[in-house]
Design a protein with these regions (language model features):
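Mature N-terminal, pre-catalytic/accessory segment of carbohydrate-active enzymes
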Residues: 1-12, 17
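Structural recognition of the beta-strand scaffold that forms the well-ordered cores
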Residues: 11-16, 46-50, 90-93, 124-129, ...
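Aromatic-lined carbohydrate-binding/catalytic grooves of carbohydrate-active enzymes
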Residues: 32, 36-135
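Active-site-adjacent beta->alpha loops and helix N-cap segments on the catalytic face
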Residues: 76, 136-146
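Aromatic-lined carbohydrate-recognition surfaces of secreted/lumenal glycan-active proteins
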Residues: 89-103, 152-168
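Glycan-recognition surfaces
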Residues: 110, 158-279
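Catalytic cores of secreted or luminal carbohydrate-active enzymes
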Residues: 265-313
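Conserved small/polar residues in nucleotide/adenosyl-binding loops
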Residues: 326-333
C-alpha cells in the first residue's frame, strides 16, 4: 500500500506514556479509544498510541515480539480492532536499539519481521525510539532500515522517528522516510520544561513540513501533575538522557490552564504533532476546551504547513529579549488562541 497523503499534516492523537508509562493494559486502551471517539474525534484527533512496556521481556522461539500476557491477555490485534471499530487509528512503540528504553526487546536486526508483525496486528502508527542503539551504526541507517521495512509490510503506517534531536537529525531525517521526527528531549509537566522546549526551536522553524514534521514532543495539557513517570530518573542506559534537561527530570508540578493554553498554541503554530498525554477519560471542561480549539487546530492542520515567524526585539528595561511567534495564513482572519 502507498498512501501518498500519509503525513501531509501533523498527526493528532493520544499517547499512553506521559500519564501511564508502563501501567498500560487492554482495558485502558479501549477506554481511551471510547473517550477519543466521543470527546475528541470531531476535533480531528484519530490516533490511539501504546507506548513502551507493552511486550514480554523476551521474543518467542521464532524471534517474534510477544505482547505482555498480563496486560494484553488476548493479544494486540483485538485491541487494534476495537480502536478501528471506533473510526480511529491504532499506534504502537518500538526502538531502533537492541532494547526499548524500558528494557523490552527492541527492533534492531528485527526490523522487517517486526514491521510484518505490526501490519498483521493492524498498526497504523509506529513511534520508534533511540535507546540502546549500537554505537557502531549511525542512527540515519537504522531509521532508513525501519522506514524501508514499513513501506514493504503491506500496510500504510505513520512512522514517528524519536531520536531526541541527536546526530544532526535535521540534515537527514526527511530522506529516511520518517513522517515526523523528535527534535527535543522529553517534555515534563511544568512551565519551565514547556518554555525550554519552545525556545529550543528558534532557528529550526524551517526544518519541518509536509510529510516530515518537527515533533517537539507530546502535549502535557490537562495533566496537572498527574503522572506515573518519576521512574525516568533511573540511570539505565538511554533513559537518563531523555529528560529535557539532558540529566534527570525536574520535579513534576503541573501548570495552570493559561499555561496549558499557551503550550497548546505554541505547539500548534510550530506545526508540531498534537499528541495528547493526559488521561483523556477524565478531562476537565477547561482541558477539553483547550484541546478542541478549532481555530488553533486549523493553523496546525493547514495543508500548506507554513512554519511560524520568530520575532525578537530588545525592548525590555532589563535588557533581555522579547520573543514572539506569529503564523501567517493566506487569509486574514482573527483567531483567538
Amino acid at each position: 500500500m502507498d498512501n501518498k497523503f500519509l503525513g501531509l499534516t501533523p498527526p493528532m492523537g493520544w499517547n499512553s506514556w506521559n500519564t501511564f508509562t508502563w501501567e498500560i493494559n487492554d482495558k485502558l486502551i479501549r477506554e481511551a479509544a471510547d473517550a477519543m471517539a466521543s470527546e475528541l474525534k470531531d476535533a480531528g484527533y484519530e490516533y490511539i498510541v501504546i507506548d513502551d512496556c507493552w511486550s514480554e521481556k523476551q521474543r518467542d522461539s521464532n524471534g517474534k515480539l510477544v505482547p505482555d500476557h498480563w496486560k494484553f491477555p488476548e493479544g494486540i490485534k483485538p485491541v487494534a480492532d476495537y480502536v478501528h471499530s471506533k473510526g480511529l487509528k491504532f499506534g504502537m512503540y518500538s526502538c531502533a536499539g537492541t532494547h526499548t528504553c524500558g528494557g523490552h526487546p527492541g527492533s534492531f536486526e528485527h526490523e522487517f519481521d517486526d514491521a510484518e508483525t505490526f501490519a498483521e496486528w493492524g498498526v497504523d502508527y509506529l513511534k520508534y525510539d533511540y535507546c540502546y542503539k549500537p554505537d557502531y551504526i549511525p542512527g540515519e541507517i537504522l531509521y532508513k532500515r525501519m522506514s524501508t521495512a514499513l513501506r514493504n509490510c503491506g500496510r500504510d503506517i505513520m512512522f514517528s522517528a524519536c531520536n531526541w534531536g541527536n546526530d544532526n537529525v535535521y540534515k537527514w531525517i526527511r530522506e529516511s522516510g520518517a513522517h515526523l521526527f523528535r527534535s527535543t528531549g522529553d517534555i515534563q509537566d511544568n512551565w519551565e520544561s514547556i518554555k525550554r522546549l519552545a525556545l529550543s526551536q528558534i532557528g529550526n522553524e524551517c526544518y519541518g513540513g509536509n510529510f516530515c514534521h518537527n515533533d517537539i514532543d507530546m502535549l502535557v495539557v490537562g495533566m496537572h501533575g498527574g503522572s506515573n513517570n518519576e521512574w525516568i530518573n533511573s540511570t539505565e542506559q538511554g533513559v537518563n538522557v531523555i529528560a529535557d534537561s539532558g540529566e534527570t527530570m525536574p520535579k513534576l508540578g503541573g501548570c495552570t490552564d493559561e499555561e496549558y493554553r499557551t503550550h497548546f498554541s505554541l505547539w500548534a503554530i510550530m506545526n508540531s504533532p498534537l499528541m495528547i498525554g493526559c488521561d483523556i477519560r477524565r478531562m476537565t471542561p477547561a482541558t477539553k476546551e483547550i484541546l478542541t480549539n478549532k481555530d488553533v487546530i486549523a493553523i496546525n492542520q493547514d495543508i500548506e504547513c507554513r512554519g511560524p515567524y520568530c520575532i525578537k526585539q530588545w525592548n525590555n528595561p532589563d535588557n533581555v529579549f522579547s520573543v514572539s511567534y506569529t503564523h501567517l495564513r493566506a487569509h486574514e482572519t482573527r483567531h483567538d488562541l
